[in-house]
């Protein structure tokens, strides 16, 4: 990490935690964990399998359903069902994601790009990024799907940020005035001023930057104290940052490819952490056999309820 942007590791105020196994062999490329308080279940995607998976609070009673194509991210809808970020584009479904309806323009299969991480803002909009399968520079974008209104009963996705490379985590401050965003290739978290009335993101600037030794920032979540928790692909950790970008804590994860995280459980005090075995060599997988599992810890801070798409 850049010492100009955060505390140095090992400083006395940096708290350390260790993650423990929650669900073994959850998937090849698990991402987008979300806690659904209505069902008291953890949900996550396995991107290239195209599945939306779930388990109960103890890690049991696992379920899986397929969208029939790669699924980068999702969000629950206010009235039930899901908004899906598929390889071909955005879609809406009921509880069964195999029966989805496209929203806006769709890409043909096979596509040179696919959808990646996504999340909802505090006002019911859904944001999702795209990336090239080969991670070509500037081959993706960040899209926004507004909630339907009387004036626009059938909104379509709109481009928010063009020319991204690996569009990843996005989250918002509690008051909705700031949006945090990760393009992993940039090795930093950026912050924007956010207009809740329009969904506009303006005045992009670095929030915290990282060194190659840290790995790549991937997914993120924002806790009830407005601290960011950032997963590090290749970094074997989730790191917590204060609202002014100082390192406040590190969760050590026993596998290298940490993809995302979310808070859940009855009190929103469990931090659930997804990981991947995607593109590991046989030797690497032998060294880290729990890759692709979901981990958890109870760090003390708590999260906020999942934000739902209002459409």
Regions found by a protein language model. Give the residues of each.
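A short helix->beta-strand "capping" segment at the edge of beta-propeller domains
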Residues: 8-26, 56-59, 104-107, 204-205, ...
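A short beta-strand motif characteristic of beta-propeller blades
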Residues: 18-23, 60-66, 100-108, 155-162, ...
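Beta-rich, blade/repeat-based domains predominating
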Residues: 25-39, 67-83, 109-125, 160-178, ...
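Conserved beta-strand positions in repeat-built beta-propeller and related beta-rich domains
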Residues: 37, 42-48, 82-88, 126-136, ...
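A short loop-to-beta-strand structural motif that recurs across blades of beta-propeller domains
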Residues: 51-53, 89, 140-143, 188-190, ...
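Hydrophobic alpha-helical segments and helix pairs
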Residues: 97-160
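Short loop/turn segments immediately following beta-strands, especially the blade-tip
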Residues: 147-151, 192-199, 299-303
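Blade-level signature of beta-propeller repeat domains, shared across WD40, Kelch, NHL, RCC1
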Residues: 264-311
């Amino acid at each position: 990490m850049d010492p100009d942007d955060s505390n140095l590791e090992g400083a006395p105020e940096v708290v350390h935690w260790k993650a423990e196994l929650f669900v073994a062999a959850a998937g090849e490329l698990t991402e987008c964990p979300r806690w659904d308080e209505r069902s008291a279940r953890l949900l996550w995607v396995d991107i290239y399998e195209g599945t939306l998976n779930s388990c109960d609070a103890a890690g049991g009673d696992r379920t899986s359903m397929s969208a029939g194509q790669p699924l980068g991210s999702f969000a629950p809808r206010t009235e039930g069902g899901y908004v899906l970020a598929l390889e071909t584009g955005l879609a809406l479904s009921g509880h069964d994601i195999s029966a989805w309806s496209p929203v806006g323009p769709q890409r043909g299969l096979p596509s040179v790009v696919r959808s990646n991480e996504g999340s909802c803002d505090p006002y019911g909009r859904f944001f999702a990024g795209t990336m090239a399968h080969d991670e070509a520079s500037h081959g993706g974008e960040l899209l926004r799907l507004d909630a339907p209104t009387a004036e626009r009963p059938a909104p379509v996705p709109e481009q928010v940020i063009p020319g991204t490379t690996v569009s990843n985590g996005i989250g918002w401050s509690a008051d909705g005035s700031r949006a945090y965003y990760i393009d992993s290739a940039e090795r930093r978290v950026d912050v924007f001023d956010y207009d809740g009335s329009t969904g506009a993101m303006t005045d992009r600037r670095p929030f915290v930057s990282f060194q190659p030794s840290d790995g790549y920032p991937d997914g993120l979540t924002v806790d009830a104290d407005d601290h960011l928790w950032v997963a590090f692909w290749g970094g074997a950790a989730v790191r917590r940052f204060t609202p002014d970008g100082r390192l406040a804590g590190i969760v050590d994860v026993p596998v290298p490819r940490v993809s995302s995280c979310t808070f859940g459980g009855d009190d929103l005090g469990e931090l659930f952490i997804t990981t991947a075995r995607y593109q590991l060599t046989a030797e690497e997988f032998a060294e880290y056999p729990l890759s692709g599992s979901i981990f958890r810890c109870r760090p003390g801070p708590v999260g906020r309820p999942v934000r739902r798409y209002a459409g």
